[in-house]
A protein has these predicted regions:
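Active-site phosphate-binding/coordination module
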Residues: 24-127
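Residue-level signal for inorganic ion chemistry
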Residues: 38, 49, 73, 154, ...
Length: 270
């Protein structure tokens, strides 16, 4: 193990998109083998993502992960049998405030209610890309009104990254004490429950597995990942992560197209 990391590692919590996965949402052979090496060494490995659990299950299956995993940035904690261990909905007032603000901007707005992906415009330019990533189709609804009390995540998305950054900065004070707004990727602004962040997910998973936080590692690339960086014993940012994300990790590995997760496992964990 590299001398940067002092405590033996018992649990690795890893982001998916932009971290574990290649840009085409697949696992590289090198990363697959590195995760298997971790598991063979008796080190727990599981995932935390902004995705709904349904969109995580194929990778969970490929890696034979038998541990609970966190969807919606920790909004849903799910065990290997698909049972919910924790479920956090976005406060209805936060949902309404968010929808009201976003209505005045050229962004696509999606709601996630458990595994259902709800939208009003099936022809939005981001829909096809999202469907490829999630692996299933959206449900078209006339109105979001019936779902205000059931929301696990709101997504605002478009190709205008500066607009999403501006909306994030406006939503954070607006939703203070009600919900969390963070960009999981440059083109995705997520609004999740106040309790739903990857840091809380890491703490819950560590307690579930009886692992001290000092013996945990968090790996990620997005604006929703520093929450787990701050709680983990050791934190790793991907090479292509935004500068403000890299600055909050203890070390930086290669990018996801360079098998950065495998590099981190080989260099800092095994």
């Amino acid at each position: 193990m590299n001398d940067v990391k002092k405590d033996p590692v018992e649990l690795v919590l890893c982001d998916m998109d932009g971290t574990l996965l290649l840009p085409d949402h697949t696992l590289s052979p090198r990363t697959f083998e590195a995760v298997k090496s971790l598991q063979d060494a008796g080190i727990h490995f599981t995932l935390a993502s902004g995705r709904p659990p349904k969109a995580m299950r194929e990778i969970i299956k490929q890696l034979d992960i038998q541990l609970p995993f966190a969807g919606f940035n920790g909004g849903l904690l799910v065990n290997a049998q698909g049972e919910y261990l924790q479920s956090h909905h976005v406060h209805p007032e936060a949902v309404r405030k968010t929808l009201d603000l976003l209505a005045g901007h050229k962004v696509e707005v999606w709601l996630f209610v458990e595994d259902d992906w709800l939208l009003r415009d099936p022809h939005g330019e981001m829909v096809e890309h999202e469907q490829q990533g999630l692996g299933y189709a959206p449900q078209v609804v006339e109105s979001f009104e019936p779902y205000l009390h059931q929301v696990h995540k709101i997504v605002a998305t478009c190709n205008d990254a500066p607009l999403l950054m501006s909306l994030e900065q406006r939503l954070q004070p607006l939703l203070k004490g009600l919900a969390v707004a963070s960009r999981s990727q440059a083109r995705y602004l997520d609004i999740t429950a106040l309790e739903a962040n990857k840091g809380n997910a890491l703490v819950t998973l560590a307690e579930y597995l009886d692992v001290p936080l000092a013996r945990t590692v968090a790996i990620g690339d997005g604006g929703n990942d520093p929450a787990m960086f701050r709680r983990a014993g050791f934190s790793v940012a991907m090479g292509q992560a935004p500068e403000e994300v890299r600055a909050q990790a203890q070390v930086v590995t290669g990018s996801n197209i360079e098998d950065g997760v495998a590099q981190a496992i080989d260099r800092f964990i095994l």
